[in-house]
């Protein structure tokens, strides 16, 4: 206490993980937030979230990442789950084609319930299971380009691209918010009410993060 905060901004961004059951959403979250992988992970019941600190351009950003059950019987939480989200990772399992086919339905639900523009990343998880792959990298990339999403394949098991996927979404949110705050007091007020506390209006944008077809493995 008593220490003067010279950073000027304080950010808290809500990010949601969506996708069918058993695609690895919970393990992606635990790998990113705690660097852990649970081989006996059970289906999520209801909603869970973790908060992770990330530093961007000298500013402390708190990402509040929400994980929810993918089963249809839990869809009653939909509106509250999406409300106030700044970003979303839409996750499918590269070994299960049906989870990839569900992506457009998840995108429709996301766009229906979110109350603001959302930074979106399509994530093909379990890329360590190359021998039983059912969805090609090219298919994932093509869908991401069609829908205007970032794209990345990940493995929660061996941590491939997990940090990178989350960090791209967080940085994209940061850049979007910074640009809008530069010229909009109304937007600043909206964010303060919804889910972000901001003190100053400084632009921290980096256009190099805005590749809508980012794909790495």
Swiss-Prot record:
Domain of life: Eukaryota
Membrane topology per record: Lipid-anchor
Lipid-modified sites (S-geranylgeranyl cysteine): 214-215
GO biological process: protein transport
Major localisation: membrane
Cellular compartment(s): Cell membrane
Keywords assigned by UniProt, alphabetized: Cell membrane, GTP-binding, Lipoprotein, Membrane, Nucleotide-binding, Prenylation, Protein transport, Transport
Gene Ontology cellular-component terms listed: cytosol; plasma membrane
Cited SMART domains: RAB, RAN, RAS, RHO
Residues noted as binding GTP in the record, renumbered to the chain: 19-26, 67-71, 125-128, 155-156
Motif (Effector region): 41-49
One function term, GO molecular function aspect: GTPase activity
Any single Pfam family the record assigns to this protein: Ras
Annotated family: Belongs to the small GTPase superfamily. Rab family.
Role this protein plays: Intracellular vesicle trafficking and protein transport.
Cited PANTHER family: DRAB11-RELATED
Protein name: Ras-related protein RABA5b
Organism of provenance: Arabidopsis thaliana
